Amino acid sequence: MLTVHHLNNSRSQRVLWLLEELGVAYEIVRYQRQPDMRAPAELRAIHPLGKSPVITDDGNTIAESGAIAEYIIDTYGNGRLIPPPKTPERLSYTYWLHYAEGSAMPPLLLKLLFTLMPKRAPALLRPLVRKVSNQALTTLVNPQLKQHMAFWEGELSKSEWFTGNEFTAADIQMSFPLEAAAARGGLDQGHPRAMAFLDRIHARPAYRRALERGGPYSVGR
């Protein structure tokens, strides 16, 4: 049976959700973040990088969110949650499936990093670290985030979902960046369509079932 190596408050929540949408049976092995929010060393026994998400299935170990989504759709989807091949929607699907981690998440991770750095710096260095962090946020990170959030808002003005009128696995993939942006990027300020997207996904029965299976989930808080 497919096994999800599930780290709390992590991208692996999307994997549970995708499996619930498809009705795939799976087992969960749970891992808790350490006090510094890092994944525990036990995950390295599953994959050398010790990162989440990771799944094991039929003798295969698959890491990386996009690769996992593709594997699950190819293996268990039976044409569901993916547009037909050789259509504009399929091209859009592929783009968003990989954009989520390749382009959307880096500025959100930098936002988290530069926000946490002053809090974790030694007391004597804290004023300097805060100054450097604020400068990086102001000149580099926040402008990038605003650009991405405006991009999402514009795309979601065309249709309810990122690939068109049908919900797909690409929307599941995009959920994490939007949830992170709502938590710490200001998405709730002037991006009503993006926030409505979050309302729609949070209301899906499979999303709620994934929360019940995975446990408490809070992105970037």
Residue ranges and their predicted role:
Residues 1-135:
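GST-like domain detector, emphasizing the conserved glutathione-binding G-site
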Residues 36, 218-219:
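Generic structural signal for helix capping and beta-alpha/helix-loop junctions
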Residues 204, 214-217:
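A short, acidic, flexible beta-alpha connecting loop/helix-capping segment that sits on the rim
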Residues 100-199, 203:
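GST-like fold's C-terminal all-alpha helical module
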